Regions:
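Conserved class I S-adenosyl-L-methionine
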Residues: 71-80
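A short SAM/SAH-binding and catalytic strip from SAM-dependent methyltransferases
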Residues: 149-160
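C-terminal substrate-binding/active-site "lid" region of AdoMet-derived donor-dependent transferases
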Residues: 158-245
């Protein structure tokens, strides 16, 4: 069996349903891929796209963190196919877990920059297909409708949506992101938060070509507007966080479809 086939068999069944592999097996398989091959699998395989690659250990660690918050009503926003919520339900019995997504990324061009649209013109790139149990609402509308205690979100694009979620009437926002500016960055740390290292250790994503050498996921628990410790730090020039403030880049729009 080739290295690529070994990875895809860990991620999907023969019928195309997604799998939850053990972390050790996935790490070993990823380590045998050629450089750049993981991105091609996650981006171009017609069963994708994939961003977060949930493992059994991640699901257990994430469920334990949510359970420690005492949250019983959980909403995953920008949920795509809803796979993460579906994986968590058996581990969080007695809680209500709902997944929602606006459907904005069903058209693959909606999740690309202008440069990516030029680069991949003529290339078959899958859009994000909503799962059968995923409600079609944008994130803030879903919060108004579902009134969750905890909002779960994975791989939001850079922008202000994460801040809007933190400012919504919820107790917690649990964000699974990635280093390197591909998801909201350290500027969001102005808001009161906790880092979830125990979850990060078990998180794998499309950037983890060599997970035994370097991991890229970042998992942060923010206190939402309903939490008694909700707060936002005022950041001034010279403060450490000031370097992460948003900057306007000429020639490239920072606007992404809301999910």
């Amino acid at each position: 069996m080739g290295a690529r086939e070994n990875v895809t068999r860990l991620l999907w069944t023969r019928s195309g349903a997604r799998r939850i592999p053990p972390t050790r097996a996935l790490d070993a398989a990823l380590g045998r891929l050629a450089k750049g091959e993981l991105f091609r699998i996650c981006e171009f395989d017609p069963r994708g796209p994939l961003y977060l690659l949930p493992t059994r250990e991640l699901v257990r660690a994430l469920a334990a963190r949510i359970r420690a918050c005492g949250a019983r009503r959980i909403l995953e926003v920008a949920a795509g196919d809803g796979f993460l919520s579906a994986a968590l339900r058996p581990a969080l019995r007695g809680t209500r877990i709902v997944a929602s997504d606006s459907g904005a990324w069903a058209d693959p061009r909606a999740r690309m920059t202008a440069g990516e649209r030029r680069e991949f013109r003529g290339v078959s790139v899958p859009g994000v297909r909503l799962g059968g149990c995923v409600l079609r609402f944008d994130a803030l509308a879903a919060i108004r409708r579902m009134r969750p205690e905890l909002v779960l979100v994975s791989w939001l694009p850079p922008g202000r949506l994460l801040e809007r979620l933190i400012g919504a009437p919820v107790l917690y926002v649990l964000e699974i992101g990635a280093k390197g500016g591909v998801t909201p960055g350290a500027w969001s740390w102005r808001f009161a938060h906790e880092f979830c290292e125990e979850v990060e250790r078990n998180a794998r994503c499309r950037l983890d070509e060599r997970p035994r050498l370097e991991l890229h996921s970042r998992v942060t628990l923010y206190y939402g507007a309903r939490h008694p410790e909700h707060a936002r730090e005022r950041v001034r020039p010279g403060d450490w966080l000031w370097q992460f403030r948003p900057r306007v880049t000429a020639g490239r729009s920072s606007v992404r479809p809301q999910r």
